[in-house]
Design a protein with these regions (language model features):
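Short, polar loop motifs at secondary-structure junctions
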Residues: 27-35, 94-99, 132-134, 152-156, ...
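Anionic-ligand binding region
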Residues: 131-172
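Glycine/small-residue-rich loop that forms an oxyanion/phosphate-binding "nest" at active or ligand-binding sites
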Residues: 57-114
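A structural signal for small-residue-enriched, beta-sheet-centric alpha/beta enzyme cores
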Residues: 253-256, 406-412, 417-566, 573-583, ...
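Generic N-terminal targeting/processing segments that precede catalytic cores or assembly contacts
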Residues: 249-400, 404
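Glycine-rich, highly charged phosphate/nucleotide-binding loops
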Residues: 41-57, 171-182
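N-terminal beta-loop-helix "entrance" segment that forms/cooperates
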Residues: 26-48, 103-106, 158-164, 291-295
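A C-terminal functional module that forms or caps the active site or interfaces directly
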Residues: 162-169, 173-213, 218-222
Length: 604
């Protein structure tokens, strides 16, 4: 088992990451303020000292500890360190991103030092953003100079302030919807003090507000961690470290997007030109800022101004057609100041609108273009750069993808919004669906036709012969996501083809019909059957159902169609509620062989 200490944004990252493993784990917080609904989480609350942590780990066979607690939870970090050393359990510290130190900020190693510096600097009115637990630590200052403390609006915080003897009239309350400038403009301090709480703790917002007001800024730096903690940043860093200590924790292995691979090779090629080096491993930032390191397959200097680097795509356990194939980047320094993306072998050409890319340009999506640009401009801020991404096997592999129906011809796309491939992930599917819908809207804004897959699409296309092929998209199990995208893009109307297995689940209100999330509910089927007055024979058949498609075998065609139409009407109510009243939707229920189709409403 794994024990996580959370209660923070990083705690939620740990929950999301570990849930991918499909195994239960313990999640410890001091209080109950953080709401956690993940079914795999076994929640424990209350402060834990070192002996308590040690006993818990022994009793519950803990193999790994993840410290995702607040950076200033110094006592907890120390207790985790003592217990983990005693038991020989490894500790992963999930760290925040911390901005580099700035010259206009006074950094202090302790609250004592901060008080000394602020008194010496002549601070007259201090806005303290360090929390109620620090009122006592700043006592020496607020007993001499005017101080306003911003605290959480809860009784526990008020009790602490009262216990410390801090004047209640000099308290203000934090509200999430209020901008950081607001308290400054109300009380007019000449300085603020805050903790080095990192980007997820709102540190930058506080600093920028103080800068705009021209205030002195004092920051108490985060305390050191036990030296045996293994520090990681971000979800992927945590994923990799958990795999290191518990190799079988995640059933499926993550990989990297084509966009990440292209970014790494482009950076490696430019480094070869600028530094005349052939780096075997290259660091790049993922779109969320997390730093990762990937191994390069080869680097070649083609001329003093041109170099090429390659990487072998690792998609993990995702069924990616490009897994194991080469992705290359050629970088050339040219005249001018522009960074250009040129057409490369095996990368598709955009031929249809809707993808957010110019027609005729290489199919390199916005996020990879951004990450490549950021990495290259960090090394070479000024001057022209031509970047050519290529996939030697791309043209042949593209035939196995949806690229042709997206209007991308001659090769594959360089894609990826997170930089990481999660096998069979919801995120990847919805991202692909969004691209298909974008092209569909560009070519057919009047109607989007959604189907669960190729089988139902083949049947339903006959109903809409006037529509281009791109107007038909697959929703898989994610009906709710597909409808949200349709609403977001303002299609004039929507048609949804569905087979009876998914229809039974959707009719009950389940917008995600995956078998892991919901199964056929016979009690619900009986309820609908009673409402439409079916015979005892139909109820007996429902009792014996193994698969919902067996409903097509109801002996009475009249009863069958009456029951199925009632289910379809319920499906319509569920789906229509996800769209605006001005966006009509029609549903088509398709039999297993495609020979019978029920529609509701019949016309829109």
């Amino acid at each position: 088992m794994i024990l996580v200490f959370g209660g923070t944004t990083e705690g939620r990252i740990a929950i999301d990451t570990l849930s991918e493993g499909g195994k239960p784990f313990y999640y410890s917080t001091r209080g109950e303020q953080q709401k956690v609904e993940e079914p795999l989480v076994q929640r424990i609350t209350g402060a834990m000292d070192a002996p308590t942590i040690e006993e818990f780990c022994r009793t519950h066979e803990i193999r790994l500890i993840i410290d995702a607690a607040h950076p200033f939870a110094q006592e907890l970090h120390r207790n985790i360190g003592v217990a983990s050393l005693s038991l020989g359990i490894p500790v992963i510290r999930l760290e925040r991103n911390y901005p580099p130190h700035a010259q206009d900020i006074t950094y202090c190693s302790s609250y004592e030092e901060a008080v000394d510096r602020m008194l010496a600097d002549g601070v007259r009115h201090l806005l303290a953003l360090t929390g109620t637990q620090t009122i006592g630590k700043l006592r020496r200052f607020w007993q001499q100079r005017k101080t306003t403390f911003r605290i959480l609006s809860r009784q526990e915080s008020l009790d602490i302030a009262c216990k410390e003897g801090f004047p209640e009239q000099q308290l203000i309350f934090y509200t999430p919807e209020e901008e950081e400038d607001a308290p400054i403009s109300r009380i007019h301090p000449d300085a603020i003090i805050t903790k080095e709480s990192g980007e997820s703790g709102g540190f930058l917002e506080k600093i920028e507000a103080a800068r705009r007001a021209g205030l002195r800024i004092y920051v108490v730096v985060r305390p050191p961690l036990p030296p045996h903690f293994h520090l990681v940043e971000g979800q992927h860093g945590l994923y990799r470290m958990v795999r290191r200590y518990i190799p079988d924790y995640f059933p499926l292995k993550r990989g990297y997007t084509t966009g990440t691979c292209a970014t790494v090779t482009a950076k490696a090629a430019l480094m070869a030109l600028l530094y005349e080096s052939e780096e075997q491993e290259v660091e790049v930032a993922l779109p969320d800022g997390e730093i990762i390191t990937l191994s390069i397959e080869s680097i070649e200097r083609l001329s003093p101004t041109k170099a090429r680097a390659t990487i072998r795509k690792d998609a993990g356990d995702d069924p990616d057609v490009i897994h194991g194939h080469i992705i290359a980047a050629t970088v050339e320094l040219v005249a001018g100041d522009e960074l250009r993306f040129l057409q490369g072998e095996g990368v598709g050409v955009v031929t249809l609108p809707g993808l957010g890319l110019p027609i005729g340009s290489p199919a390199i999506n916005a996020t990879p273009r951004s990450t490549i640009t950021q990495e290259l401009r960090a090394l070479y801020p000024e001057g022209g750069i031509d970047v050519t991404i290529s996939i030697p096997d791309g043209a042949a592999l593209a035939a196995k993808t949806f690229n042709p129906r997206l209007g991308i011809v001659g090769g594959l796309s360089i894609i990826g919004t997170s930089g990481i491939v999660k096998p069979f992930s919801h995120e990847a599917f919805v991202d692909s669906l969004r691209k298909e819908c974008s092209v569909a809207f560009a070519l057919s804004p009047s109607r989007l036709v959604m189907n669960s897959g190729a089988k139902s699409e083949a049947y339903i296309k006959a109903l809409y012969p006037q529509l281009p092929p791109q107007a038909f998209v697959h929703y898989g199990n994610f009906i709710g996501d597909a409808l949200s995208i349709a609403q977001e893009m303002h299609f004039a109307s929507v048609s949804l083809g569905i087979m009876v297995g998914k229809a039974v689940k959707l009719a009950e209100g389940n917008l995600d019909t995956h078998s892991k999330k919901v199964v056929m509910n016979k009690d619900f089927l009986h309820k609908v059957a009673y409402e439409v007055g079916t015979s005892s024979d139909t109820h007996a058949l429902i009792d014996e159902l193994t698969m919902a498609r067996e409903l097509w075998g109801i002996p009475s065609i009249q009863e069958r169609d009456c029951l199925l139409l009632a289910l379809l009407q319920r499906c319509h109510s569920v789906t229509a509620s996800q769209l605006s009243p001005n966006t009509p939707i029609v549903l088509h229920l398709i039999s297993e062989g495609g020979e019978t189709i029920l529609s509701y409403p019949e016309k829109i």
